[in-house]
């Protein structure tokens, strides 16, 4: 489980995600840097846009904290960075609302860079502004 840095002090979030995984029947392991000690995935402060080289170093370091290939997170940006680092990252909502997931069937998801995701968000906002 990768805990998002913005929830570093939100112990109830950490506990809730782990409870959901337990209730869904998934086996998971803790890593050393989690919860209050979690590391940023690299997206914080829009580093991905302002300093791509630093972004790559930060997300690679974070991904290397995991011995496992499969990572569960509850932040869309964190999921994207873990995928960029070559991990099979799954958002908790995919597990809640999707089919049962096993580590031997890595999902074929289209990977988008952070810049692509932000561009789509901006385009969606502009479309919605025209409606309202």
PLM regions: where:
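Iron-sulfur cluster-binding electron-transfer modules in prokaryotic oxidoreductases
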Residues: 1-132
């Amino acid at each position: 489980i990768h805990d998002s840095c913005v929830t570093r002090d939100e112990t109830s979030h950490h506990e809730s995600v782990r409870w959901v995984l337990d209730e869904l029947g998934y086996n998971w392991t803790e890593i050393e840097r989690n919860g209050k000690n979690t590391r940023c995935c690299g997206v914080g402060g829009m580093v991905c846009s302002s300093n791509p080289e630093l972004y790559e170093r930060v997300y690679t370091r974070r991904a290397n904290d995991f011995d496992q290939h499969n990572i569960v997170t509850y932040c869309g940006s964190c999921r994207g960075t873990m995928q960029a680092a070559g991990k099979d990252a799954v958002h908790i909502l995919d597990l809640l609302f999707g089919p049962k997931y096993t580590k031997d069937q890595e999902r074929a998801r289209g990977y988008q860079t952070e810049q692509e995701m932000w561009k789509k968000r901006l385009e969606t906002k502009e479309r919605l502004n025209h409606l309202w």
